[in-house]
Amino acid sequence: MPPACRFTREQIVAAALAITRERGFDAVTARAVADTLHSSSKVIFSAFSGMDDLLAATIDAADAQYRAYSADFVRDSADPPYKAVGTAYIRFARNEPNLFHLLYMRDRRREDHSGDAENIAVLVDFLMAKLSLTREDATLLHIEMWAYVHRNAVDVRPHFDVGVRPRHCGAVRVRAAELGRRAHQPDADGRV
């Protein structure tokens, strides 16, 4: 009978997350995790079906860290919630560049994106309620604001190539104001 594993799945994922945070996701190997735990790589395979299983759990743990970071920031911020979410995203990129890269800059073309639509719908509904926008205008505003916020988040990460600068995003602010004004103009029946 094989000996019981001395490390829990959570401890192994925490080691993989620490490696990601320090050296990037590509540095997460069976050997690196084992070295971090001062153990052999066999402990990983007694708790996980393989490296892909561990890597998926590491991505989930990084996502949970971002969600907790964002929720704490929004709760403690004096800014309106929508702005605070964007600010939290940018600060997370600056404070946790390797986790940010893992979550938001890896190739996700082969991944399931079904949860993304639900997250976006919550924000679009919020914008519709707060700014009296149509779903189409709120979606457009959110996409434009997300592009602006994501570009700023990419820029603030340490080791960013300073030769690449974002375009002036005043157009996004103008578009948001334009959509907001249009939402408050009376329609043909005089309703706002």
Residues covered by each model-derived region:
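Amphipathic alpha-helical linker/stalk segments
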Residues: 60-84, 118, 122-129
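Amphipathic alpha-helical packing segments from all-alpha helical-bundle domains
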Residues: 107-144, 169-181
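Amphipathic C-terminal alpha-helical segment
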Residues: 102, 146-164, 178-189
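Amphipathic alpha-helical segments used for helix-helix packing
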Residues: 90-111, 119, 152-162
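Hydrophobic alpha-helical connector segments
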Residues: 57, 71-101, 135, 141, ...
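Alpha-helical DNA-contacting segments of helix-turn-helix folds
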Residues: 20, 53-62, 103, 111-119
